Structure formats: C-alpha cells, structure tokens
Amino acid sequence: MRILWIVAVCLIGAEGHLSQFGDMINKKTGIFGIMSYIYYGCYCGWGGKGKPLDATDRCCFVHDCCYGRVNGCDPKMGTYSYSFQNGDIVCGGDDPCLRAVCECDRVAAICFGENMNTYDKKYMLYSLFDCKEESEQC
C-alpha cells in the first residue's frame, strides 16, 4: 500500500494539495517535505496505527486526527488557497472544507518545524507492522 501511495504522490506532482502541503513543510523546515515525512514513523503517510514514536510522528498523528474532523470533501484531494506572509502560512479561499484542510496542513507544517530536533532517520520508511502498541484516540 505504501508503494502505491508513493506512486500517487509522484503522479500528482505539482497538482493537488499534497504538493501544497509539501511546500508548507519546506518553508517551515527547509527540507523537501513530502519525501522526508511520507513514511516516517507510525503516522506519517497513508493510514497509521500504534503510538506515535516521537514528537515528529505525533505531528502526523494530530494531522490525521485533523483530517478526520474535515467534513464535505476528501482531505487528500483538491487544491486550496494559501500564501506566505512574513514567514507565516495563511489559509484563504471561500470553500470551508478546503480551508479546513489547509488549516490541518498549516498546523502540521508548523509542528514539523518546531520538532525538527526529534526527527530521527531510523523512522524513515518505517513499517506499520512495527507499530504494535494500542492506538491512541484523537
């Protein structure tokens, strides 16, 4: 399933909100976001289970929970409006659902930036099979 997700991200390219999320991550961390976080820990990328492994993985857990609260659109599809103003990410647009998705991504990008010191390369390409502890509630 993870291979399919990587292929989907590559096919999306510069279209869709995943590239927008990657741009936000890049602005807040200075690293290429999507590839650095897509399969990090137990929660970054498609799906998630178990307990977050560190603060970076917790950013993804909270992001997943945020997406779970979005109503009216698919959080992984569509394009939202946002801009960077004085180093801050500002979500805009008239569609309340896409604006909510943007806010989820904005908060996650900020979280990644604030927790870069917890990023551990051993959790890159981490297998969900190794996430065995009971999952937390959102």
Swiss-Prot record:
GO BP annotation list: arachidonate secretion; lipid catabolic process; phospholipid metabolic process
Signal peptide boundaries: 1-16
Reaction catalysed by this enzyme: a 1,2-diacyl-sn-glycero-3-phosphocholine + H2O = a 1-acyl-sn-glycero-3-phosphocholine + a fatty acid + H(+)
Cofactor(s) this protein cannot do without: Ca(2+)
Residues engaged in binding Ca(2+): 43, 45, 47, 64
Pfam (any one): Phospholip_A2_1
Keyword Kinase assigned: no
Leading EC class: hydrolase
The keyword Phosphoprotein belongs to this UniProt entry's keyword annotation: no
Keywords: Calcium, Disulfide bond, Hydrolase, Lipid degradation, Lipid metabolism, Metal-binding, Secreted, Signal
Active site (record annotation): 63, 105
Tissue: Expressed by the venom gland.
Family indicated by similarity: Belongs to the phospholipase A2 family. Group II subfamily. D49 sub-subfamily.
Entry protein name: Acidic phospholipase A2 ammodytin I1
Organism expressing this protein natively: Vipera ammodytes ammodytes
